[in-house]
Amino acid sequence: MEKRYGILILSTFACAACFLLSDCAGPAAEQSSVQPPYDGQTQDADVFIDMPNLRQYGGYTCGTTCVQMVMNWLDPYQADWNLTAYEEELGTNEEAGTPPGSIVSFFEENSVTVTAKENRTTPELASALYQGHPVLLCIQAWAAAEDGYNTQNSDDADTYLAEGHWVICVGYQKKELGYVFYFNDPACVGYCMMSEQDLNNRWIDMDTEGNVYDHYGIEITADGTSYNPDGVFYLE
């Protein structure tokens, strides 16, 4: 059964910090024959939570940007903070990024109800999404270990969990071989998607103090139904 939240936006798929490059415009006939570089569409999802989709700046503000997306989704009419204000409030910095505890504390101090825990399973993740609850995940940013990280060998300090990244899981599609999950990724233009197997492999991170967060997620249980992606504010 399909369950959807809001109006879906056709979007692109990219992995953290990947940019899609295209050639300059050519003849109209040639353009019409080129297929968009999408790996899927949000309309394919069984469940999709439509949230504001914002871009991070720099290489360390992914957590801050995810928090801003959540706050704008929960209260779009009072979303007058910019990313710098969130960065200061969360204590985000280039060395540590935004630790999980800082995000949870910020939500609690701002009366946003959350459930934060480790060792979540993908069926539990799908269940949260089905209830209309987006989930912040700390993962490894890249799809392949060749991109500079490993999730197994803790003796290799240079690569072990070296590419931590925050994303928001906003939807899923149940397929014969498992789930496909959809994400707001602050390092990407548009939405992203990832297979259940790939997510399980990458769903782990470590903070600067050496604390490992395995299958950690911050489930937003507060109500975000007031957000309307097609709504327009009067420019006063």
Cite the ranges covered by each PLM segment.
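Active-site nucleophile-adjacent alpha helix/oxyanion-hole segment immediately C-terminal to the catalytic cysteine
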Residues: 34-92
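Bacterial N-terminal signal peptides
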Residues: 11-20
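Active-site-adjacent substructure of cysteine-protease-like catalytic cores
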Residues: 120-188
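Bacterial N-terminal signal peptides that target proteins for export
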Residues: 1-10
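Noncatalytic regulatory segments and standalone regulatory/sensor domains
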Residues: 31, 35, 157-161, 168-236
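Second-shell loop/turn segments in exported
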Residues: 48-60, 87-97, 109-117, 125, ...
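Solvent-exposed loop/turn segments at secondary-structure junctions
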Residues: 57-61, 68-69, 91-95, 114, ...
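Sec-dependent signal peptide cleavage junction
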Residues: 19-37
